[in-house]
């Protein structure tokens, strides 16, 4: 495991401590407190998972999966169920093999999210990560309605050493994307990252804006692979799920960036979003630096949640 990965892993483990207290300590008391596996046993686990923001749908699927495995393996001792439960949660969250296809093709990534969730910061961090992978990145500052969004993104562009187009407050976001596409094509960029607005309180305007941007991309950059990521604040729990649902009504969302995972008691929301909406969490953030945004890995996340020690082979397999 690289030093960067080790650092992220330890921050993730400590960052999920409140979520762990919220979920795991209660579950451990059930595993150790019950002498037999019965309906009450499953109901207690279900209650704790729902209280931990894992959500009703995900919890039901996890419990059903657990019941099947208990039956298959003829398990009688409740304490033996913990490993099966961990495995069931991991299965709910697998991002799939093509989740990061945009990294390997000429791509446009639209990033949307409401104010205050860490959207522009996430765009900057993602630019830095892609640049570190040797990709040629262009940023489009198309969130032109938020004061100083362009200035903030410019700081990140400088830090990541990538080019930024736009940034003028009040400009037409679609016009910024048009200019950025021209720049990306002229410079033969690998990835064009577009920081776009997320004014959910005015869904009609947002929908029109995204339609306009998408029309420009279809016309000007038809061969580019398209990705649309929504940035959500993990500390808002079920509110984050509601936002993801609303955004999916106005855009074809392909993934989630979940920020502020350090110090939230609501980390279980990562499971809920994936299960309820079928949208995978692709990145999680646990701090302020570029290294604090990492690809989501269900195995790592659930191990960190339950504080299961990482196996070395498990970690080295995923090193880039």
How would you describe each model-predicted region?
Residues 1-98, 104-111, 126-128, 132-139, ...:
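Non-catalytic terminal/linker segments enriched in charged/polar, low-complexity residues
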Residues 90-93, 98-320:
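P-loop/Walker A NTP-binding module and the surrounding RecA-like catalytic core of P-loop NTPases
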